[in-house]
Amino acid sequence: GPGLTRELARWMVHGAADISMREFDPRRFGEYAKPEWQVIKAREDYCLRHEIPFPHFNRLAGRPIKPSPLYERLKAKGAVYEEVYGHERPRWFAREGLEQRDYYSFARPKWFDMVAIETKAVRESAGIMDISAFSKIEVRGPDAYAFLDRLTPNRLPQKPGGICLTHLLNRRGRIEAEVTIVRLSQDQFYLVCAAFFEQRLIDHLTFSTRGEKAEIINRSNEWAALTINGPNSRDILATCTDAALDNASFRWMSAQQITIAGHSMWAFRMSYAGELGWEIHGPREHMLAIYDALWVTGGKLGLKDYGSFTMNALRMEKGFKGAGELTNEVTLPEAGVMRFVKMDKDFFGKGQTQESLEKPLPWVCAY
């Protein structure tokens, strides 16, 4: 229609549209979208044309296409999966005799009580989730720090092992993506963001280079990740590693390469769920063994599997923003994320951010 054409023209001329074009961006599909897969999905779309568009409608044709190392194990434990950028990610887990399938409703679906069980576990004991679907990009080289520092409003970690949350902006000073950046070594950085931003993040970084000696490497299909959260998460993880996990030895928003169940992995002390927790990132081939090892003790300490529905509920209650709110329709002040912005440094989009601060905000994210 004419609205789409208008935004496409703005995108071509100004480098960014006025509204979010995620649902029209061809980069919402990855390399997995081969011709044979496209045929399967086209047939599915035709068959679903007159179906009721329930919230969280799950399209099942052509799956699984990018299962994680934990896929079969979690499926056997009741995981009901969703597809994000080709990846299979658990939504929730069927328990207490509930059939392992999708339930649709405009009111309260049957999975609501299952999510409540998962949420309670993360708050009161511990929960574990397969987060392998996240985009995982490495930037390394002698100019890696200067390159990323020029793009990011927040101050990058000054030493290896530091972590920061920051945002990438487009030419209009609006949010392109929220990114967690981990400094693995002096000239090596690891970026984590939402699954469907994978190619967009790579493009944003690639098109922003100015001849810097910085290599951009996609680790999304090579590495897997899981997160363990809750009051008992430290005790559970401690049984699988000799690393010290106390507050003094392993600070909040810090990263260490530690041995877990005999495998060298990166542990990040951070938690999107808002509780005490760690994310564990590393080679795909080790993740199942680590998951099983955590369950040896975790099963005795109230550990439960949880999915994206629980994660989303917990992060909203904590006040953490998500990709749904952080779009190219909002500036940093409008999104309410200025605590992650250092106006005393230079960054791409700083001028537009300053303008937004000086004017009455047309709207703000209310939580």
Locations of regions flagged by a protein language model:
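C-terminal catalytic lobe of FAD-dependent flavoproteins
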Residues: 1-66
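Conserved, structured C-terminal
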Residues: 16, 55-82, 89-91, 95, ...
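Active-site-flanking structural segment that lines cofactor/substrate pockets
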Residues: 100-127
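Short amphipathic beta-strand starts and helix->beta connectors
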Residues: 117-124, 169-178, 210-212, 259-267
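Active-site acidic/histidine clusters and adjacent loop/turn architecture
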Residues: 132-134
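Short amphipathic
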Residues: 136-138, 365
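Internal amphipathic helical hairpin motif
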Residues: 142-175, 232-263
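Well-ordered mid-protein domain cores that form the structural environment of catalytic cofactors
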Residues: 154-208
